[in-house]
Amino acid sequence: MNQTSHRKAKKAVIMTAADSVAIALDDLASGDRVKIRSLLQEIVGELKVSDSVPYGHKLSVKPVAKGAEVIKDGEVIGVASQPISPGQHVHIHNIVSLYVPPPRTKAPKARREP
Amino acid sequence: MHFMGYERPDGSVGIRNHVIIIPSVSCGNEMAARIAEQVPGVKPIFNNHSCSRLKTDNDLATRALVGLGANPNAAAALVVGAGCDTVPASEVADGIARTRKPVDYVDIEKDGSYGKAVEKGVAVARALLAQTAALERKSCNIGNLTLGMKCTSSDTTSIIACNPVVGQATDFIIAHGGSAIFTETTELIGATHILTRRAADESVARTLCRRVEEMRQRIKRAKVDILRSQPNPGNMKGGLSTIEEKSLGGIGKAGTTPIKGVLEWGERPRTKGLFFMDGSANTQIVIVGLAAAGAQIMSLSMGGGVCARLRTSTINTAGGGLPVLPIIKTLSNPQSLPEADYFDVYVGGVVEGRETVAEAGKRLINEIIAVASGKMTKLESFTSPFQEVWEFYSIGPLV
């Protein structure tokens, strides 16, 4: 049996057809095949995941250019801070709010090597 | 569409028929408990309003106390106070009396002593119980309902399931001529652009923005700026990336109709439709504010997580929360399925693709009609040795 093809398809849900992201309903790993379904329970697509995407996080279902709007539930939830391709994890590393500067995150302290 | 409710003299309709005891100030809590102990069936509503507060907060407390008594789920009210209170019991009773429901008050100064005030309170409470016990439910239009809303322990499933499901109920009640109120000003900091698009007119949009900015400035005076603190680390861990995305999830529960107006905390809407109420996101304060604004039924939509595992979360109290505001709890996250029994409606099937939002919405609407007609909520059916002391919204410092 083929070693790669029997990986079970994992699930994600897309809120509206206009959306550029789907929400992972399984923990996804790079290389996983994911079935995208709508809220009406129809399978609307399938794609290959290129990052690890935790349960509840977003993955891109269409290419988004740098600076372009990212759409979820038919609404703009931010813009891409770098180009995003289908199957990628979409989160604070590649989208930013249009209204609020990114949250202050504590920069890790420089570690002195012993 | 109809439910079986209690008609009140002011034309409002209750879904419960409680005789409540309202201490006008926290000093009256013990007296209220003493009276309630001797009159089984009456419901005390303990609160934390005390002296050493500024006028703005005394005004907020007065409106809340009157609003709790005026709430259609109260058939009658007894107000208790000391006599020296910042919010006099007589003033609260006068406010409630405008609804023409039976109301009376006792205080130590007027009645002569603690013992005499309690003794009279017991007699009044018994009389009010007797006077209201015979009231019967009648068929009433859904349009008489005001639904209060809050979401809590939100996670990524909230936007998929519980909030849009609640949105269906909101739209349904408003379509039948009723009202709905959502609140939590803090949650809108940085996200007013999402909500102002829903405003019925320019003035509503402006008021909304002003309220949010006032809240932000109050927080800044405490030397914290939370503009950049959203979404919080927990939200981000759960997959929310921007404030827009977080707010979008929360608004789902408000359905799709325009926002007719912005209410002060505890203020009753003057017309029907969807309203936003200014105030804190603290669950207890939200519950009191909604009840004081006249909501007879409330929806608490929960994602999941540890909060879902607290049986009475997030309203720890004997006999199911604030007596005048039954709460229907909706659970969203399939990972919290073991806790589903603590909830009135489980909508994890929407997340898993076994049920549509419309189907789950219909189940929630049926539950609302059943609870409005007398079915006990999960929270109402739990007994607990603990009694909540309800917190009132305050904006000034304690002095």
Question: For the regions a protein language model found, what residue spans apply to each?
Answer:
Chain A
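N-terminal small-residue-enriched
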Residues: 2-114
